[in-house]
Amino acid sequence: MLKKHRSGDKKCSPSTRLLVMGLTFASMTIFPTLSQAQKLMTITGSSMLYPLETKWARSYEKKHPGTKIDVSATGSGMGYRQAFLGDVSIGASDAYETKNIKKQYPDMVNIPVAMEDVEIIYNLPGISRKIPLRLDGNTLALIFLGKIGYWDDRRLLAENPGISLPHQKIRVIHRKDPSGTTFVLTDFLSRTSHEWRDEIGRDMSPSWPIGKSFNGSAGISGGVSAIPWSIGYDGHYWVKRSGLPSAALKNHDGYFVTGSLDSITNAGKSAIKARPDSQNLDKSIVFWVPGKNVYPASNFEYWVVNPHLDSESMMDVRHLISWVLGSGQNPSLLESAGFAPVPMNSTRPLIREWLRNLLLGNSFKVVTPG
């Protein structure tokens, strides 16, 4: 233990003073003051939304040097769970709040932040990619139910007269972890196939009757790439990244449409136009909307917020959401990550009302992207 100097002691030598100054500087560096510490925000959940969230986080941090945002892809199920438990600032989900989800995670607020889709990917060696595989919802459901087992099944041949499909067993690939991507697919299948609806239904983690499972969006595209004669599903970004072909799905008006930023955007606009007074921007209003170039398995991507966060954390969340629904909707951020914007002109009043409720009555202004 150091002793105090008495009044008669000699003054410290220059070398001692330098040592003390060095230790003081080091302690300031190692143990920063509160003013030096960064605000930390955490986002976890949807692996589909992860690439866009990462871009948003880095862009937001540049504009707000005192903020650090950690983003992780744990699956939509974990996004809901950790937001509900208050373990993260924001949960991310491809799945809207069904009655079951609301019962399991009460009081959560879903805010649409972007649009994406779920595409059907496949690996058919030696088959030309110039013409995409065509599938209607019922045929696709029968494949995932194991009731269509070979690529040259008469129902597949009837939908694809321009493709020479071989007599090869179909290898089904699906998600292992609770997934919003799976929720979107099973919701689509439930709306297009009575058999799927009655036997499996809509779920983040259904009881798959057949197939091989993989974790995460990257796991699905990786599995399909590695397994010949396989079929699976993934989001637009991951499909483009994998280089795999995606099928054209039959939409409400009978057109076979592939997933693209245009067809996703058209689905959102058509949905809002068809149901302008809807109080829930969920996928039920995006499926089966009319239009020619409208992709039928488009979906809103959500941030899930716990309204019981402490006031300081909620203020940080408010600022981030304000930015995401404003400058964050800029095409330079969205399109590079494979996403389309929320149709803001139509949904602005509804989103503003949601955020007023979420932010304890504070007013909220959705700014113009730029």
Pin down the residues of each PLM region.
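N-terminal secretory signal peptides that target proteins for export/translocation
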Residues: M1-S15
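Generic N-terminal simple sequence motifs
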Residues: D9-K10, M28, E61
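Bacterial N-terminal signal peptides
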Residues: V20-I30
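Flexible loop/hinge segments at secondary-structure junctions
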Residues: Q36-G370
